[in-house]
Amino acid sequence: QFQRYLSGLIISENKTVEGINKLFVIESRNQSSLNRLLTASPFSEEALNQQRLALLNSLSGTQVKPKGVLSVDDTLLTHYGRHFDEIAYLRDTVNGGYKWAHNLVNLHYSDDQTDYPLHFRLWRPADLDKIEQGLQALGIPLREGKFALKESNPKKWRQYLLGVWSRNQGKPGVAALYQSKLWIARDMLQTWVNQDPEWKLPVTFDSWYTQPAFCRFLDKELGLPYVGTLTSNDQVTLPEGRVTLEQFANELKQKHLDTVASGGKPILHKIGIPYKGEKETYYSYCRTHRIHNYGKQRLVINFNESDLCDSPSFYNSNRLIWQSVGITRIRRHRW
């Protein structure tokens, strides 16, 4: 039955139990047999995943390599109905709008030969009643004036309650009340380090996961290098004061264009990185700066076009001697 299910996931457009079962017309069985595999069979998903990873690591094309990269992200699994456990009405940042979906958090492995997930876990919507009761039981006070928001503005109540949870999540018992996507990512990375301590692969992620506490966890607790993604509103500290990265990039761009026009040495340098057998070109600035809330970081600002007419990308890393080529190559492996 497991072979039938796996084959169906690979080749069937309809990945329901009924749809997969209908594929097997020669050796047909009642779909209840396949359903029992998923609902009543005692197999361990974690043990199955470890066997999958062991198989991948036994093959030269898919084994973990010294230049491999780990990336953290989450994926929406869209549904066209609402009657599913753990489903939520979530914003689709790729296609826009909101959709009913499950949200799968992924720890992914990538190198120039292969890509595959290492670990994955379903994010579950916050149980606000559980969090409220749990915080009070742990002696963490909730402001009396906020309780009216339950009826008048449920969205603000949710934001307030999760804010209290977030600020206190380092205290005993608080983290267990709710597993945010960041906490799931932390747990998967901790599992990876525990299972494969010899590997110190860099971790990369988008701007949603680039948060100070998560970066400190990777640096101080796991000892892993990381490449994050900053936004144009993040701030860099310069001798003359703190400015946004957008302002800083605009200043660099103008200085670069003026210098090049007068025959001087360019401020942004042309770099090339290998990716999946191809070579990609960027125009890059790389220096160590103090980034607000992150401390001292290696900052990379990349443009795609030689005339710098496009919007720049901003990357940060805890490896202060790394150069823009290495940082950009690592970030490129976030699929």
Q: Locations of the language-model features?
A:
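Short, amphipathic alpha-helical "recognition" segments used to contact nucleic acids or chromatin
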Residues: 2-11
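Active-site-proximal, Lys/Arg-enriched surface segment
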Residues: 6, 39-151, 274, 289
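Short, conserved catalytic/metal-binding motifs centered on acidic residues
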Residues: 20-21, 66-80, 107, 202-209, ...
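Short hydrophobic/aromatic-enriched beta-strand-loop microsegments
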Residues: 223-229
